[in-house]
């Protein structure tokens, strides 16, 4: 969908209107007159603290079959950062925190959502041994 003068050089939006701004510095600028982009140098995180928290919760679940108090605390830190209710509060409306395979799926979803656009999904699917089904959808 083009909403400018028809010149592709002046196009400033994506096909669907959504644009991922994860890892884009708010100080980066684009000058349309000179067609110059000014990038701000910054350190790209190889691993975020949220990934460590999610990995801990997942490992704790795989080891014990349930979530410990520490795991719930770490999940809540990740959710609190983006303004979501706590894990227990979210699942209280559905009858409480699930267990077993359903909890595993929920932890996978939490990880997929938090780490979206970071290049982790394929390796997670291989680690979870679901790549052969997920990639064939």
Where in the sequence are the language-model features?
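Acidic/polar-rich alpha-helix caps and helix-coil junctions
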Residues: 1-137
């Amino acid at each position: 969908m083009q909403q400018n003068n028809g010149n592709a050089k002046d196009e400033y939006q994506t096909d669907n209107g959504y644009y991922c701004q994860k890892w884009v510095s708010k100080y980066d600028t684009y000058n349309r007159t000179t067609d110059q982009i000014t990038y701000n140098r910054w350190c790209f995180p190889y691993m975020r603290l949220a990934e460590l928290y999610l990995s801990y919760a997942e490992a704790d679940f795989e080891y014990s079959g349930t979530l410990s108090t520490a795991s719930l605390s770490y999940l809540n830190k990740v959710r609190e950062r983006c303004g979501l209710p706590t894990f227990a509060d979210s699942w209280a409306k559905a009858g409480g925190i699930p267990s077993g395979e359903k909890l595993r799926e929920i932890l996978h979803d939490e990880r997929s959502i938090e780490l979206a656009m970071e290049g982790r999904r394929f390796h997670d699917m291989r680690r979870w041994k679901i790549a052969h089904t997920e990639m064939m959808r």
